[in-house]
From Swiss-Prot:
Keywords: Activator, Carotenoid biosynthesis, Transcription, Transcription regulation. One of its GO terms (biological process) is carotenoid biosynthetic process. It comes from Myxococcus xanthus. Induction: By light. Involved in carotenoid biosynthesis. Antagonizes the transcriptional repressor proteins CarA and CarH by preventing their binding to DNA. Can also dissociate preformed CarA-DNA complexes. Does not bind DNA. This is Antirepressor protein CarS. Monomer. Interacts with CarA and CarH. The keyword Cell membrane does not apply. It comes from the Bacteria.
Amino acid sequence: MIQDPSLIICHDVDGAPVRIGAKVKVVPHSEDGTISQRFLGQTGIVVGLVFDDPATQYPDDPLIQVLVEGLGEDLFFPEELELAPEWARNRIAQHRQAVRTGGRSSLERLP
């Protein structure tokens, strides 16, 4: 039997970038094409926080489960939602990509 280490939470978590029940808007475009076209620019409600690797993601780096009426639910990275100014979302996305590829991001070099 394979055990899934994911942690799915449906209540507020101190330190998470959003609150359950918060209204959020999905960014209007996806440069890398990872967001389903039908969700782009849509507004929905946060219904869950998903931590694929709780040891490294909890509490501030979850996937955010969003329910969009008439479309259903999908998971989004924080930078794929309009929670912060675009410049901040871009910095977060660059950092996340650098971490995935094993490099150091400019955020890690800051004092």
